[in-house]
Amino acid sequence: MIDENGFRLNVGIILTNYNQRVFFGKRINKNVWQFPQGGLKNNESHVNGMFRELKEEIGLTRDDVIIIGKTTKWLSYEIPKSYLKGTSNYKGQKQIWFLLKFIKEDIAIDLNTTTKPEFDQWTWIKYEDAIKKTAKFKSFVYKKAYSELSSFFY
């Protein structure tokens, strides 16, 4: 779903483990690392979209996590023109971010729950390192999400 300004409505997921590390996935067949995220469907709530993306991208369900917090407003970023294909009015992503606590064992994480997986590798990483490792155009949103949700981390 794309809004009137060309931004795709989206949810982002920050999944933390018991060591205060965050899940970070490498996009399949690319050297690009990011948090799980994905577009909302028409009339889909933020929470339902987040749980759908969590299942599709890393194989987790409601029983595997606890919602700790979420951003109160949309955070957005523009995708560089060199990444865009075609002539649509699409500009970037507009996201609500969720902070989740992972309460199961790592074995529960499954990157192959769909016929088109998003990630081919993953790791637990410090949040600050995730900001450094992601695409530059996304790092601002990662910083904003952390700023708003950081009180829940410690």
Positions of PLM-derived features:
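Acidic, metal-coordinating catalytic segment for phosphate/diphosphate chemistry
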Residues: M1-Y18, T87-S88
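Active-site beta-strand termini and strand-to-loop segments that position acidic
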Residues: L15-Y18, R27, L100-F102
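A conserved beta-turn-beta hairpin within the catalytic core of GNAT-like acetyltransferases
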Residues: N29-N31
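A short gly/proline-enriched turn/hairpin at secondary-structure junctions
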Residues: Q34-G38
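Unchanged
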Residues: L40-A135
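Charged phosphate-binding loop/patch that engages nucleotide di/tri-phosphates or the phosphate backbone
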Residues: Y127-Y154
